Design a protein with these regions (language model features):
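Active-site environment of divalent metal-dependent phosphoester hydrolases
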Residues: 35-38, 68-72, 136-138, 168-174, ...
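Beta-strand-turn-beta hairpins that frame and shape the catalytic cleft
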Residues: 20-28, 101-105, 115-131, 265, ...
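Structured beta-strand-rich core segments of catalytic domains in phosphoester-bond hydrolases
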Residues: 63-143
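N-terminal, active-site-proximal structural segment of metallo-dependent hydrolase catalytic domains
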Residues: 2-3, 16-79, 295-300
């Protein structure tokens, strides 16, 4: 018995001396949760979404539309999907936030210059820029993109991820968008005298192009077919903002992204947009998750 006890103590001591191998796999998810589950009133949708996130087990989660949330409330939810650490941009309007299995350091909160704001954090040794760009106007979005792109440049980081709801289209989706008259008509119908989502009546690619020019990599394009990349709208909008499933299908678009630095893109092994099944009922947006493997030391 004494020998067994002594052996156990020695093992415990060695575990504190032997260096732990660095984590080589990292799953990063972004999700717009649609008005913070109706400002917290839709408890069933919230409960089901939390359970789903727990099942997918991301290491880092960026959230948009945390309406009605503060850091304490976000922490309570995040602990249910296994994240001890949380940061939120603000507690009014439409906040963005970040949750993680490892400690998070806030490097900057940008609020006044942007429509919804941007949260710039570091976790897992990676710089995260959580964004939610203006839904109203292509010129406002381009202005925001230039501000955020400058922040990324100033960070001088070679390991960064820009992620969230960009409310903007990618030039890599142009082949699909150019013939989508239903979506174009919807944008034209929603225009006002002050704001325009189309640029001279056409889809605008300048916002996402601004980030690509940093350079950053749109990692979804390497893993997801053009026809399967839509992140909005889901069927949950039928009866309110969409009349039928046919209208949902006709107005599909990709406006949520995970963009990474070139060196991080080298370690990206998969991207999934969860635009089928249970996620039809959680939010008007679909979540996106990128998987990274850093086994190659030169990309760590």
């Amino acid at each position: 018995m004494y020998i067994i006890l002594l052996f156990s103590i020695l093992l415990m001591g060695l575990s504190n001396v032997i260096p732990q191998a660095p984590q080589t796999n990292l799953n990063v998810m972004s999700y717009n949760i649609w008005n913070g589950f109706d400002w917290g009133k839709d408890s069933l949708r919230r409960k089901n979404c939390i359970r789903w996130i727990k099942d997918k087990n991301p290491d880092v989660l960026a959230l948009q539309e945390l309406t009605g949330y503060n850091e304490e409330k976000l922490k309570a939810d995040a602990e249910k999907w296994g994240h001890r650490y949380v940061k939120i941009l603000k507690t009014n309007g439409y906040p963005v936030g970040l949750t993680s299995k490892k400690p998070i350091t806030v490097k900057e909160r940008v609020i006044d210059e942007l429509w919804h704001g941007m949260l710039y954090c570091e976790t897992y040794g990676i710089d995260f820029f959580v964004v939610h760009l203006s839904p109203a106007d292509c010129n406002l979005r381009l202005k925001e993109a230039n501000i955020i792109a400058q922040k990324v440049k100033e960070s001088k980081s070679d390991k960064f991820i820009i992620l969230g709801d960009f409310n903007a289209h990618s030039p890599f989706d142009e082949a699909l968008l150019k013939d989508n008259q239903s979506l174009k008509k919807k944008y034209l119908k929603n225009k006002s005298e002050k704001y325009f989502n189309l640029r001279l009546g056409e889809f605008d690619y300048s916002v996402v192009s601004t980030f690509i020019a940093l350079p950053s990599i749109d990692v979804s394009t390497n893993f997801i077919d053009l026809n399967e990349r839509h992140t909005y709208p889901s069927s949950v909008l039928i009866g309110s903002y969409r009349k039928s499933f046919d209208e949902v299908k006709q107005t599909r678009e990709r406006i949520d992204y995970i963009l990474t630095s070139p060196i991080m893109a080298k370690s990206c092994v998969n991207v999934t947009i969860y635009n089928k099944g249970a996620t039809e009922t959680f939010s008007d947006h679909y979540p996106i998750m990128a998987e990274f493997n850093f086994k190659d030391e030169k990309y760590r």
